[in-house]
Amino acid sequence: MGIKRALWWMVVCVVVLQVSAQHWSHGLNPGGKRAVMQESAEEIPRSSGYLCDYVAVSPGNKPFRLKDLLTPVAGREIEE
């Protein structure tokens, strides 16, 4: 009797795990189909590039630009 009960609970646990493990979130359809995701991705407008020219500058040039911006300010402070 104890073995049948333990086997029964094991089968119930396996079934519960299998049923609860299959979930469909974020609009995914059963079977891993992503039709909804593709439609929403097509609705998003694509950007052609950077919105700001300063962002497109390579990281090596940024300190020089900062120095060029601060030089006139430092010169004005010395003159005053």
Swiss-Prot record:
Q: Which InterPro entries match?
A: GnRH
Q: Is Signal there in the keyword field?
A: yes
Instruction: Provide the Gene Ontology terms for cellular component.
Output: extracellular space
Where is it localised? Secreted
Signal peptide boundaries: 1-21
Alphabetically sorted, this entry's keywords are:
Amidation, Cleavage on pair of basic residues, Hormone, Pyrrolidone carboxylic acid, Secreted, Signal
Under the GO molecular function aspect, what terms does this record hold?
hormone activity
Q: What does this protein do?
A: Stimulates the secretion of gonadotropins.
Q: What is this protein called?
A: Progonadoliberin-1
State the encoding gene: gnrh1
